Structure formats: C-alpha cells, structure tokens
C-alpha cells in the first residue's frame, strides 16, 4: 500500500515525479506534460486517457468547486521549495493524500479520517464489530432523549448494551450467554426488543436480529423507528453474504449469496432512504446499497449508485472519504472480474471506462486489453442522450488520442466562453489546444493557452495551463517568451526546467542578472550558463561571465569560485577561470583538458542539466508506429545552447595521444581513463566504449612508460 508522504528529489520533482501505483509499492515517473497517451501515475486536472480511472471519476462526477477544495493549494508549498515542484502532474495516493510538496496539515479531528464513525462502511459491511462502539454511544444518547423512560430502566438498558459488547465482540466473549434486561414500561420494552436484535446481530443470528429490529422499527420513538429499520437492512445484508466469501477472498461467490436476503436488504435500504432521505444513516445505507448491487452482480445498478454517490458526495454526510469512494469504484466495478461495460447506463461511469480504453497500450497496462473502437463509441450515443457535451468530448478525445484526426475533434469542441472554467470546461479547451497543435496550428494553440490562463480559478488549473503553454513555446523555439515581463508562466519549477534544458546563453545571462526574479532562479540561470559554457568550449564567455558569481555564492556556484588546488590523487589544477583561459588560448592544452575533466568528475552537472536523451528509434531515423504520436514533454526539445557537451573519456584519449604533452599529464590521463571503468567494468566517462584489451594496454603503458609517477605506483588493477 502507498505511504502517505511521497518525497521527491529536486530533479525528480521537476521532471519525473516518483509516485506509487495505487495497488503496489512500485514507483513510476510521469512525464512533465499535460498531454499523455499511456497510463500515468501522475494526475492531471483534465479528463485524460492517461489519468488513473479514480482521478477521472472524480473530475467527471464531483462538483468542481467541491473537488477543488480537496486538492491541496499550491500556495501552501513553502516558497523555498517552489522551484522544485512543478505541481501538475501531481502525485497522489488513495489514502486520500495528494502530494505537491505542500505543508502537511494537522489531521487531528479531520473529517476525512477513515476511522471516523461516518466512514465505518467504506468498503461495505466488513466486520460487524466495527460499529459496536459507535452503536453503543448512539444507544446511550437515545436513552437519554427518550421520554417516559424511568431512570432505573435506562440504567439497566445501558448496562445490558455494554454487556452485549463484552459477550460478543470482546475477545473470547462470543459464547457467553446474555440476559435480556427486565423492564416494565412500554418504551423500555421497545428498547429491550432492540437489544434483542443487537445481541442476535453481533452473534451472527441474522434471522433473529431481523425480526427484533423490525419489531423495534414500529416504535413511536423516533430513534428506535429509524435505527430499527436501518439495522433490519444490515441484518439482511449480512445474512445474504454470510457464505459468499471463501478463504478471505475479496471476490464473492455469487452462487453462494442468499438472494432472498439480498433482495430484502435492497428493499429495506431503499425504503429507509425514501422515508429518511437526510437520515442519520443515509450515507451508510447508500453505501450498503452499492454493496447489495455488487453482491448481486448488477453492474447497471452499481454504476447508477456510484454516479449518485459521487455527485452528492459531501465530507459531512457521505459514508466514505471521496478517494475511498474512488477506490471502491475501481475495485468493485471497473476492475471487478467479468466486468462488462455494455451494461452501464450511467454516462459518467461509462465515460470513465471509455477514457481508460483510449490509452496507448504498454506492457504493464492491463486496462487496455480491449481498446475502444470508433464503432463502439458511436453505438453508445443513446446512453449519452442526456449529456451530449460529454459524448462530444469523448468522441473528440478518440479522434485526438486514437484516430489522429484533429480536424474532426475541432468540429466537436466548443469555443471558450470567457467565463471561469470548471474542470470539464478546462478539459474541453485543453483538448481543443491539443487538436490545434496536432493539425499544424501551434500558434493558434499557443494563443488559446494564453487566453485560458486568466479563466483558471480552481486549483491546479493554472499550473496545468502554464505547463502546456511552456511546452508549446519550447517546441516552437520561443523560450524567451516564457521569461518576458508579461509572461503568464510564473511557476518557478517550469521556469527552472526551461532554463536548465532549453535556454540559450543570452537568455541565461539575462536571467542570471534579472533582479525581478527570485534569487534561486538567478542562481539556476547562472549555474546553467557557467556549466554549459565551461563544458561546451565557450571559454571566452566563461571567463567573462564567471565574474557574475558573488562573493558569497550558493553551494552550486562555489566550484566556479574556488582557487586552484591539489586533488585527492595529487594532481594540481588551477581555478576554473584559469582552466578556461588556458583552453581559450589552446583548446588542446593537455593540463587544461585534464583539469576540465577533473572539474566534471568532481562536480558533475546537476541532474536537471542533462541533455534530453532521444529514444533509440529517434537516433535511427523514423519512429515506429507506436511512437509516432508521442506528445512532447517539458524540456524535451533540443537545447538552444550551442555546442556539444564535454565528455571525459575523449579528453583523456586526446591527452594520451598528444606527443607534446607533459609526461605527468599523460600519465594522469592514462590513470583516469583506466579508472573510468572502476569498479563495475562499465564506462562512466562518456564517449565510445573502450575494449578491455585496450584498457589492458593502457595499464601496461602507464606502468612501463611512467614507472616513477605516483599514479603508476598506486594503480593496482585495470577493469
């Protein structure tokens, strides 16, 4: 199961948020993109095939304003952490926690606590003893409120209720006999009858419990009347499922479900909800009705009940937290054995399943066994008669994600109205922008992304739109626009990604000196500028720009300001500035090459600076069919910073091959090139792989040609 807190490293937070699948501890890395084709463990605030079905279900069926309040507020991310948190896609687990790096709330007394009495039937009836304590409290309160009940009888009834708990649910107590209290008043006898039912219920004598609770439900006392009816339904439900589960299996054997009792439970709970639509047990009765439908294999009824449960969900009234309800939808319906979506009549639940079936398949995604065809979707149209906009959205989604006919999608999607967007409205407009980009109109999509940002009023909407706009600008080679004074892209993590991955030297230099931005982003810009200049042979620019490092630099910038020194192997290098100056004069300078390699070895680039690695098919030429429509991610466009990144191994080889090089420098280059393979036997210095016989020759050369060098004397092996 998932842990509550998912702490990401800086780079992972920016580019690929590690989160866990809902059903395992395996982590995954969702791309930094609003548009994704395959299943993603990162959630997005738009209806998407890539979303977990539980996220889509909430977006489809829960009021947007209410759902937004359950999402964490990006403003609660501590300012110092915002450069590390891209927010969307957001990581989540289904204990109810969505992690964007926000401050953790005090959960004391939290209404979403899964142990609260109102949440005790989150997964159906479960252990009947779960309701023992809450039931005793409610019974005591009812005794206190009962008129015409003598005090001594109330005391005996209260003691008898406590005795039931001790002799049924307490360890070793189920075999002990219970004595019905002796009371004479009519109201006292009615409460005693209720206790008869309680005792039978907790002893699993459900027929006797049903009879007693039904009798109590005829009382004039409001509590007995309502609670007796509700408990009669629970007794019948437990009777129905008594033999339905074998060996702790979560799946019922429907042949073993007592249908008469199940039908009775269905009738009682529906009667209860009709008589007490706002009753004290209305949330629980609704949840148990879902269990009745599940036990009976009634998919259409299940879907209808889930639709209502999501639509009317409330933290104070519903019997389960919203994300537990989403879990229940998944386990009891969408991924239940033998599930047949053709039986679903609920448009929202059907849409949840349809979106899942539009995913791009991968080897780990079992949800894509039966991809949705256009014919199937068109045949569903009558079931969406009451929700034509949702049907058009699904059809447009199919054309964008599956059929790759963006023009057909554009014909189905509305223009933005200019009003604030709910999550469905955001989904429609985002899909329009995707279709525009796919149809060769990225400029129109870019303007749409810009126009939508002021309409984003709900949590995660603005972050999603800023991400989409940033990707569009990056793909168009317009990264500078993301940093313009009037740019709507304000997310610090998005800006950091663009600086590290995409920006050219001029933009980095400008942002490194931009006093209107945060000190953290200025440091990222300057670090990226200096590291790329130093390692991409922009030596003259480096010598000039290194003067921008302050007298009290951040940790990342300190290596650029350090004086020369002897390293741990005894090799002496000057400062970074002096190394660059030497290489500016002679790019093949042996000591300069060795010292540049040593700088890279001792101060590897921050992970965010890593060049985007193309998939193997991209290097070979045309992509395979499965990769033809892979959407871009933030930081995936070729960097606008000119030059090829320095690699240590080719540098060492160049020094080895330089007949004019100082013997000390050649010996050190040999030593370091050999150690590139230590201790794994794999090259961690870049460049082409070197055969083992060549490494052996290097080792022998070091020993034979430079026997007096400290490196020849200390190196014992080659790898």
Which residues fall in each region the model found?
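Bacterial N-terminal signal peptides
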Residues: 8-17
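Bacterial N-terminal signal peptides that target proteins for export
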Residues: 1-8
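Alpha-helical solenoid repeat scaffolds
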Residues: 21-210, 219-719
């Amino acid at each position: 199961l998932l842990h509550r807190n998912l702490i990401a490293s800086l780079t992972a937070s920016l580019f690929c948020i590690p989160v866990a699948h809902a059903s395992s501890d395996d982590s995954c890395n969702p791309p930094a993109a609003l548009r994704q084709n395959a299943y993603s463990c990162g959630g997005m605030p738009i209806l998407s095939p890539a979303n977990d079905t539980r996220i889509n279900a909430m977006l489809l069926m829960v009021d947007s304003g209410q759902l937004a309040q359950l999402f964490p507020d990006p403003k609660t991310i501590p300012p110092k952490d915002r450069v590390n948190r891209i927010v969307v896609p957001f990581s989540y687990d289904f204990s109810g926690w969505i992690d964007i790096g926000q401050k953790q709330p005090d959960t004391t007394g939290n209404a979403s606590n899964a142990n609260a009495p109102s949440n005790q039937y989150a997964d159906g009836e479960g252990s009947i003893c779960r309701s023992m304590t809450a039931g005793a409290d409610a019974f005591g309160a009812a005794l206190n409120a009962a008129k015409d009940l003598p005090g001594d009888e109330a005391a005996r009834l209260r003691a008898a209720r406590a005795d039931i708990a001790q002799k049924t649910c307490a360890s070793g107590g189920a075999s002990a006999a219970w004595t019905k209290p002796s009371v004479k008043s009519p109201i006292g006898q009615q409460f005693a009858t209720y206790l008869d039912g309680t005792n039978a219920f907790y002893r699993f004598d459900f027929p006797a419990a049903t009879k007693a609770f039904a009798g109590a439900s005829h009382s004039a006392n409001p509590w007995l009347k309502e609670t007796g009816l509700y408990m009669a339904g629970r007794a019948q439900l437990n009777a129905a499922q008594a033999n339905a589960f074998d060996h702790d299996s979560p799946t019922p054997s429907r042949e073993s479900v007592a249908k008469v009792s199940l039908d009775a439970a269905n009738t009682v709970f529906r009667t209860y909800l009709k008589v007490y639509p706002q009753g004290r047990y209305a949330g629980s009765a609704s949840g148990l009705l879902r269990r009745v439908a599940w036990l009976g294999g009634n998919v259409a009824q299940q879907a209808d009940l889930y639709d209502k449960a999501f639509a009317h969900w409330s933290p104070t009234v519903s019997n389960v937290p919203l994300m537990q309800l989403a879990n229940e939808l998944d386990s009891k319906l969408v991924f239940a054995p033998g599930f047949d979506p053709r039986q679903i009549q609920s448009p929202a639940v059907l849409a949840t399943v349809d979106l899942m079936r539009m995913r791009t398949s991968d080897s780990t995604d079992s949800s894509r066994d039966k991809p949705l065809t256009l014919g199937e979707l068109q045949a569903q149209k009558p079931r969406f008669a009451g929700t034509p906009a949702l049907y058009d959205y699904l059809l447009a989604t199919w054309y964008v994600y599956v059929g790759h006919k963006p023009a057909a999608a554009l014909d189905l999607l509305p223009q933005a109205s200019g009003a604030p967007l709910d999550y469905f409205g955001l989904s429609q407009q985002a899909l329009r922008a995707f279709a525009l980009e796919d149809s060769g109109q990225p400029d129109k999509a870019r303007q749409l992304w810009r126009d939508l940002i002021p309409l984003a009023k709900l949590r995660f909407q603005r972050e999603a739109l800023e991400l989409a706009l940033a990707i569009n600008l990056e793909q168009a080679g317009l990264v500078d626009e993301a940093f313009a004074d009037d740019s709507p892209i304000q997310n610090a993590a998005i800006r950091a990604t663009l600086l590290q991955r995409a920006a050219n030297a001029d933009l980095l230099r400008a942002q490194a000196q931009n006093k209107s931005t945060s000190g953290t982003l200025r440091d990222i810009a300057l670090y990226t500028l200096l590291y790329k200049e130093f390692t991409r042979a922009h030596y003259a620019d480096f010598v000039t720009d290194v003067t921008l490092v302050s007298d009290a630099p951040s940790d990342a910038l300190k290596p650029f300001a350090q004086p020369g020194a002897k390293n741990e192997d005894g090799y002496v290098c000057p400062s970074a500035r002096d190394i660059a100056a030497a290489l500016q004069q002679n790019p093949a300078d042996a000591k300069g090459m060795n010292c540049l390699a040593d700088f890279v070895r001792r101060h590897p680039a921050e992970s965010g600076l890593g060049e985007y690695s193309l998939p193997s098919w991209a290097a070979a030429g045309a992509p395979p069919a499965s990769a033809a429509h892979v959407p871009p991610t933030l930081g995936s466009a070729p960097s606008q910073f000119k030059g090829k990144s320095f690699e240590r191994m080719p540098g060492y080889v160049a020094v080895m091959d330089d007949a004019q090089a100082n013997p000390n420098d050649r010996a050190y280059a040999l030593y370091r090139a050999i150690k590139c393979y230590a201790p794994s036997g794999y090259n961690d210095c870049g460049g082409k792989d070197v055969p083992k016989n060549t490494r052996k020759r290097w080792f022998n050369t070091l020993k034979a040609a430079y026997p007096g060098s400290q490196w020849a004397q200390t190196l014992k092996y080659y790898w």
